[in-house]
Design a protein with these regions (language model features):
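Conserved class I S-adenosyl-L-methionine
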Residues: 1-26, 38, 142
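Class I SAM-dependent methyltransferase SAM/SAH-binding core
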Residues: 30-83
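A short acidic, Gly/Pro-enriched loop at the edge of an enzyme's catalytic core
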Residues: 81-94
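A short SAM/SAH-binding and catalytic strip from SAM-dependent methyltransferases
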Residues: 93-107
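A short glycine-rich, Lys/Arg-flanked "PGG" loop and its adjoining helix->strand segment in the class I
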Residues: 109-121
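Conserved beta-strand signature within the Rossmann-like core of class I S-adenosyl-L-methionine
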Residues: 122-130
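Short alpha-helix
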Residues: 153-169
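Core SAM-dependent methyltransferase catalytic element
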Residues: 169, 174-193
Length: 193
């Protein structure tokens, strides 16, 4: 509950994106860093969703939202950089919203390897992340709030997610676009066939 309250000012922005970010997905979907389950209500009823999170607290909160969801959901306590409980070649989609900006850089290549392992050949991914702006005015504001954002949310604007995907032998980026200013970056891609 505390996290959802703390995140409320930003959620007013994110809630506009969730329906189109998730609503067109079909098949087996893995949500890495499922958090408190805020995305659940936006998945199509045909989706078979597996939600993975490292935090027991977040998973307990997410479990309360499963009943209100349209689709079948399984929650797993697992680390996105290891995914010991997730079988290979199973998923049509991987979704994560703000996972990589909270994941330390040293774990991101491992997480991306896991994404490639659990996706079916040609399976797709969609990652929504926060990055540093190139606009000086916005960047100054980000610099001012960066210590707070890192302390409270564990998020950083300087993660190298795009670089790690580009360096991956198994994943490729098929599209990148900003959803608001040049801070909220949507990265779309696929497992190479």
């Amino acid at each position: 509950m505390f996290y959802d309250i703390l995140d409320y000012p930003w959620e007013r922005i994110y809630r506009e994106w969730r329906p189109w970010l998730l609503g067109d997905l079909r098949g087996k979907v893995l949500e890495a860093g499922v958090g408190t389950g805020r995305n659940f209500q936006h998945y199509h009823r045909s989706v078979e969703l597996t939600g993975v999170d490292l935090s027991d607290v977040m998973l307990r909160k997410a479990a309360r939202k499963v009943k209100k969801a349209n689709c079948k959901i399984e929650l797993l306590h697992d680390d996105a950089s290891m995914m010991r409980l997730v079988d290979s070649n199973q998923y049509d989609w991987i979704i994560s919203t703000f996972l990589c900006c909270v994941m330390p850089d040293e774990f991101q290549p491992m997480a991306l390897q896991q994404f490639a392992r659990v996706l079916k050949p040609g399976g797709k991914f969609r990652l929504l992340e926060m990055v540093y702006s190139k606009n000086r005015k916005i960047r100054r504001r980000q610099d001012l709030f960066a210590p707070f954002v890192e302390k409270v949310y564990g998020a950083r604007f300087d993660r190298k997610t795009v670089q790690y995907i580009e360096e991956s032998a198994e994943l490729e980026i098929t599209g990148k676009r900003f959803l608001k200013d040049d801070v909220y970056l949507l990265i779309e891609g696929a497992r190479k066939v």
